[in-house]
Amino acid sequence: MAAKLLFFLLFLVSALSVALAGFEEDNPIRSVTQRPDSIEPAILGVLGSCRHAFHFARFARRYGKSYGSEEEIKKRFGIFVENLAFIRSTNRKDLSYTLGINQFADLTWEEFRTNRLGAAQNCSATAHGNHRFVDGVLPVTRDWREQGIVSPVKDQGSCGSWTFSTTGALEAAYTQLTGSTLSEQQLVDCASAFNNFGCGGLPSQAFEYVKYNGGIDTEQTYPYLGVMGICNFKQENVGVKVIDSINITLGAEDELKHAVGLVRPVSVAFEVVKGFNLYKKGVYSSDTCGRDPMDVNHAVLAVGYGVEDGIPYWLIKNSWGTNWGDNGYFKMELGKNMCGVATCASYPIVAV
């Protein structure tokens, strides 16, 4: 009996080494530890040594997953295998971007869309925006992170991206003046009168709320909870006030590029379609996403632009944590209003 047990353990170690080597090549995941005894035993106990079981166990360990039953383990494993196949088939197409395993690899597209994406309410799209071109030589490339005014990537959880896009733009303007982070939770709790709905909304309306509210509190005094609660705004904790909200003309990437290049980061919204949730690196493009105001379902922050392998791109900060994409950022093809990136763009003018 002891000999059989030893043989089985040696088999598991050998199989694990081979499986992880192949998985690491196609889908690198920084594991907590390389030791076989670190693999989640509950998952392997249910799945045994079936194909991709070790991959899934390592994924679960890496991203701190917790499944409440054997049925849930099997369900999530099945979804994981489907997503892994989708990633590999997409990457074989030699596109300008690649996909990879991340924290969303055990979710169906429908689950992801429900939990992470919203829908446009009253988009800031306008046929005649109020952005003004100012004198200045537009930089060939721009990355506002190099100027130290882009706050760290955060994770919105299952609540609204619009709050993080809004505070990201406000923080960039605020940091140019002072240097601090601002309260997403205040927007979730307090901005409903401006056509924002707790975990759903758009930055343009949020800027209007902050303007007429008399400011937004600092993150330190009003921290993020990720669920809608009772408004707890306190005037004495205001970090920044909005003087005006500037809207980019619908689809006008020249205006957007001018604003990002010479003013500061700009809040933008676009349509996330299947596959983007598993983005890893490169310049993203899609022939299935829309560009109209009612297509957009996710708000982010454009912090720069550049060119990669001959393809112009927007450099954009997301709010799905640093484990997603390129340390929380992604690149979107520039010049085609890809997925509506210039459809609902706006930025604030602030004062302290």
Swiss-Prot record:
Reaction catalysed by this enzyme: (E)-4-coumarate + H2O = 4-hydroxybenzaldehyde + acetate
Q: Which residues are glycosylated?
A: N122, N247
Q: Which positions form S-S bridges? A: C159-C199, C190-C231, C289-C339
Q: Where is the active site?
A: H298, N318
Reported tissue expression: Mainly expressed in pods, but also present in stems, roots, leaves and embryos (at protein level).
Q: What biological-process GO terms show up in the record?
A: proteolysis; vanillin biosynthetic process
UniProt keyword annotation of Glycoprotein present: yes
How does acidity or alkalinity (pH) affect activity? Optimum pH is 8.
SMART domains in UniProt: Inhibitor_I29, Pept_C1
Listed PANTHER family: CYSTEINE PROTEASE FAMILY C1-RELATED
Query: How is this protein named in the record?
Result: 4-hydroxybenzaldehyde synthase, chloroplastic
